[in-house]
């Protein structure tokens, strides 16, 4: 259950500052590093980082990139785009060390290292199944289904874990003996998957964020599906309509009443804690522009922040 949350109603969808990675050219300047967020003694999520003057460009595998502007002298500090996440770094003889931390959570801090060099994602020679139907073992006897989905981008292994409420966004990986590893870091969500594959069966482990962990097992099944989201969410039988008064981004109150709408309307429940809300926001913004006023889109943002200004 979320505590101390604030609801923000916004008519327009925000655009986000993640982008496709730009290929480096021979004329590129600055320094390249292998960045690592250390989840525990034996697990780290690594990624490429480029430092150009006071700007760090993080590369989430081969699928997206984002920038963090640094300030300070002895201790460099920066804020990640979109999400309530910051970092600090100090220079050492062979790179930088510091912390990644969330500003909307107490004591959510993980060691962050930048070591000179660069990661190379080798092409994956094996043909893994495109989809595995897995069972996640979440502890205390709790088991939940998911789909581990794999693909190749320019020959490099990419994937995600999809559940009935979303997925783990973009992960990039490589083969290891007997299976594969996937990693992803987008400024907020930190994932590592280690899997062993034998014929059509799979088993493995997932580390998420600072303390998240579960094991899984499953079988290859390209036709497997999850619970229909339209059956998961519906208006309660004792409610006749949807109505709210909420503050908009400009501070004015926005009143919505489903009984008065005159065009197709999308209500998007979102927040910076949601892995897929950024991707959904891009899609909804595209829809809104393409239909040129023929639809309405409302973003209802729930945040952990203690104040409206911070949210």
Q: What function would you assign to each model-found segment?
A:
Residues 1-5:
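Positively charged n-region of N-terminal signal peptides that target proteins for export
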Residues 15-17:
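C-terminal motif of bacterial Sec signal peptides marking the signal peptidase cleavage site
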Residues 19-21:
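Bacterial signal peptide processing site
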Residues 27-92, 123-197:
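Central antiparallel beta-sheet cores of small beta-barrel/beta-sandwich binding domains
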Residues 95-122, 204-230:
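Short, structured interface segments
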Residues 221-257:
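N-terminal "domain-start" segment that seeds a small globular fold
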Residues 254-279, 284, 297-298:
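Short active-site neighborhood of thiol/selenol oxidoreductases, capturing the structured segment around
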Residues 279-311:
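Structural microenvironment flanking redox-active thiols in thiol-disulfide oxidoreductases
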């Amino acid at each position: 259950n979320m505590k101390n949350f604030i609801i923000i109603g916004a008519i327009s969808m925000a655009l986000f500052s993640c982008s496709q990675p730009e290929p480096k050219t021979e004329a590129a300047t600055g320094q390249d590093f292998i960045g690592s967020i250390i989840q525990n003694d034996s697990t780290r999520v690594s990624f490429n980082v480029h430092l150009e003057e006071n700007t760090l460009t993080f590369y989430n595998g081969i699928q997206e990139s984002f920038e963090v502007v640094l300030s300070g002298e002895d201790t460099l500090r920066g804020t990640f785009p979109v999400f309530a996440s910051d970092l600090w770094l100090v220079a050492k003889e062979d790179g930088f060390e510091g912390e990644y931390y969330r500003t909307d959570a107490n004591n959510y801090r993980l060691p962050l290292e930048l070591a000179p060099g660069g990661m190379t994602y080798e092409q994956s020679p094996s043909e893994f199944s495109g989809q595995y139907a897995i069972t996640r073992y979440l502890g205390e006897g709790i088991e939940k289904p998911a789909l581990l989905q794999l693909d190749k981008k320019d020959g490099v292994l990419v994937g995600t874990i999809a559940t009935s409420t979303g997925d783990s966004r973009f992960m990039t990986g490589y083969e290891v003996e007997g299976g594969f590893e996937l990693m992803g870091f987008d400024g907020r969500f930190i994932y590592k998957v280690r899997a062993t594959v034998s014929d059509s069966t799979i088993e493995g482990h997932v580390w998420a964020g600072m303390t998240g962990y579960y094991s899984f097992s499953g079988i290859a099944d390209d036709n497997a599906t999850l619970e229909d989201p339209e059956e998961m969410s519906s208006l309660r039988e004792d409610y006749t309509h949807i109505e709210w008064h909420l503050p908009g981004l400009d501070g004015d109150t926005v009143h919505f009443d489903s009984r008065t709408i005159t065009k197709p309307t999308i209500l998007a429940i979102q927040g910076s804690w949601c892995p897929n809300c950024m991707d959904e926001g891009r899609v909804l913004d595209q829809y809104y522009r393409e239909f040129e006023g023929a639809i309405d889109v409302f973003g209802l943002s729930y945040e952990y922040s203690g104040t409206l200004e911070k949210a």
